[in-house]
Amino acid sequence: MARAGGNCGVWRSLVLLGLYGCSVVRAAGTSVTVDRHAPASSYEFSMWVEKDGVSSSPQIPVTTAAPNPVRNLRVEGQNNISISLSWEPPDQSSLQGLTYWTQCSRHGGQTETRNTTDTSVTVDGLDPGSSYECSVWVEKDGLYSKNETLNTSTAPNPVRNLRVEGQNNISISLSWEPPDQPSLQGLTYWAQCSRHGGQTETRNTADTSVTVDGLDPGSSYECSVWVEKDGVYSTNETLNTSTAPNPVRNLRVEGQNNISISLSWEPPDQPSLQGLTYWAQCSRHGGQTETRNTTDTSITVDGLDPGSSYECSVWVEKDGVYSTNETLSNTTAPNPVRNLRVKSQNNFSISLSWEPPDQPSLQGLIYWAQCSRHGGQTETRNTTDTSVTVDGLDPGFLYKCSVWVEKDGVYSTNETLNTSTVPISASNPVRNLRVEGQNNFSISLSWEPPDQSSLQGLTYWAQCSRHGGQTETRNTADTSVTVDGLDPGSSYECSVWVEKDGVYSTNETLNTSTVPAAVNITSCISTSGGYGVLLTWSCPSGGYESFEVKVGRKWRSENGSLCGKGVTVSDLEPAQSYTATVTTVFKDLKAQSLSTTCHTESAAIIAGAIVGILLLFILVGLLIVFLKRRRKKRQPKEVPKDLVCSCPGDILAKDFADHVRENEKDSNCGFAEEYQQLALEGQGQSQITASALENRSKNRYRNVLPYDWSRVPLQPLQEEPGSDYINASFMPGLWSPKEFIATQGPLPNTVGDFWRMVWEQQSHTLVMLTNCMESGRVKCEHYWPLDAQPCIHGQLQVMLISEEASENWTVRHLQLFHMKEQQTLSLRQFHYLAWPDHGVPYSPDPLLAFRKMLRQWMDQTTDGGPPIVHCSAGVGRTGTLIALDVLLRQLECEGLVGPFSFVKKMRESRPLMVQTEAQYVFLHQCILKSLQKPAPALVPEEAMYENVASLVYENASAIMAHESEFSASGC
């Protein structure tokens, strides 16, 4: 029978297997195992049945043998989400058509399967830090080899939030949060700190913190932490930090005085001293702490309290890491005693007393007193009292006695005086001690010799001492001596005693003074149109009490505060030359300056003014005649004489309307008469400070100067002549002579002075009655902030808090902060906008409403200083508003009102208050309106000199009324 795969020449009832040849296997059952075949090879099987030598037809299935498994399966690497495997191919004849399958399974969890035709694969998508069983098998033609299996793990995730918990000089403590992964079992954390080019220290732990010790002090380290699980490591988390430096060595006090302690030390014992900063801190228990730093190994901590105990610490910083402190206790030196003096002395002792030092604490003080004789004996005593007797001294000797203070072994500086014990057998004292003469720098003394039998071998000692200051001592064998080297204008106590054979008599003493120094006249300027001069001189060295000023035959005495400020001498003749001297006076001793020649101005200006005044007289006379004729035509009856040019006093409220109507007749003739009577009020008062050379630039208008007696003084600034001056005056009110302050609108150079005045007076209220610019001319500097950005003026900071604007006024809430005193002052500025330049408001109503609002605010803020009111010059609009407020309150309180009397009173405190007749009339109209009576329209006018090189008349009649003695009689 023919058989597939060739003729094998064998015919039996059996199963035939063909493999490039033939193999025959007999089987009596229904299955058979064929071995010794090649793996992963294709075979053709023929199967038939034989019985009794007869065979069935063959059945021919085709099949393949399974491949062999892979060899040498191994892990090539892993990270936190994958495992990389590799292997060698199976040991078989053919490797064609092989597919490798890889599967990694986590117990009870995730399984990931991959296949490849290579001999390596990466299984990803795994969980970090997890154990996996990984298997690899081979597939060919749908048949699979056996599995090769190994166990491995993914790398853990890195730690989170690695940080330094602390460090000292040999260790760094690290902490972290565990990795973010499903399982934290079986984790080991490794920490390693490495110094560049040097030491490395490694530690491991199962906790989330570790201390790496054995490090070098004051060194920079890179510290890394990683996680291990099953021998697999995470990536590193790394930070840079440093160990603390070692502490300083041998900390010691090098010295101290009453306000500081000087410390020194040796640098720390460590490999590197680069980049070290040393910090020193001295703390007083329950009180002050002062801290300083340096890169040196010594420092002085100052700003301490005298005679106080401090704990002083020094530590080292490097890269923001600090060593431990080295600490010692020490005390600042006490302040010296005050007012050391001799209470008494006898032959063998000197009793001293003093006042305790000026310092916070007087506890634990010991006072030491020592009296020493030159080249000889020294005696020292101590006490806790403020007086002591130093005994055991030799009689009749001069001693230098010193007293100092000790606290905690630290000593103050010495206070010293010279005195002597009483001699046992010495010369009698000198007689008739007297001053023979003195000059700026010396005092000449003379005396009669002592009353005794022998005058041989006598030495006279003279000593002049200034209280709390200089002492000069001289000796001579004569009965006179000049003690020089003294200060001019100073009081001295001068003593003379006798020495014989080293033994001293008692002292004879007198009080005298040196002559003051003469001044140097710096300028003499003509003023008042040639009728006066302004004389200025420099302050002399030394002391002085007053100055005698002489210009020609004019003589006056001025107090000592006027040096450097200038004095005006009046009643001189124009176009003349005068000899001027200034004599310094101290204790009835005088020193006259070198004379200078002063020249008054030419009288040409005055002559022109006189001609102008005469012409004005003529014009006014013609005007008076015209008005009188007009009045006679309009009013047949003659006006009673007691109504012409009368000076009205207080007027009853019910009569005020009649008073106004009467004055309004004949074009306000009555008001004109009243106002003329006010023209010269207040003139002739002293304005020396305002006229001083250094203050001239601070005045906006030359003819509006505050009187000396009523001006608002500022606290003077050190070494700034004229810094106490501002053009401002205290003004009377209803209840007080200083109820208001009237001032000019600030100039650019006086804004700081203006805010100083507000602060010093503690005023809560500013009233501004002008606009900064009017009719194209600057009337006031813009002295408050424009917005939220504060303005700085010296020590004062001005802030705008809020602003409320209405049709006729604006109210600003301001805050003043004193940067040195750290104090705040709140205030409001009431800015009236509707007062026209060179005029008066069109109606009383807005001003009355403004005044009512202002008065309500002032009644609420009674704890501060006086309200400060200004316009441009601080006289016209300012005077009108002050008068209106006071007179309306007078009406409310008394039922009376006296405009004339109050304006007169204001002009006694500041010139030109209620500056124009129109303002005077408007004042009456406002009062009348407040009594519910109508007010007529007003004619505007305003006047003053501008502070410019050429004087400009803004209102000739008002200025003439103020500066001349002209007074019109009648209308």
Curated annotation (Swiss-Prot):
Residues 671-930 form the Tyrosine-protein phosphatase domain. One of its GO terms (biological process) is peptidyl-tyrosine dephosphorylation involved in inactivation of protein kinase activity. It is an enzyme of class 3 (hydrolase). The active site is at C871. Residues 28-604 are extracellular. It is a single-pass type I membrane protein. Protein phosphatase that may contribute to contact inhibition of cell growth and motility by mediating the dephosphorylation of focal adhesion-associated substrates and thus negatively regulating integrin-promoted signaling processes. Induces apoptotic cell death by at least two distinct mechanisms: inhibition of cell survival signaling mediated by PI 3-kinase, Akt, and ILK and activation of a caspase-dependent proapoptotic pathway. Inhibits the basal activity of LCK and its activation in response to TCR stimulation and TCR-induced activation of MAP kinase and surface expression of CD69. This is Receptor-type tyrosine-protein phosphatase H. It comes from Mus musculus.
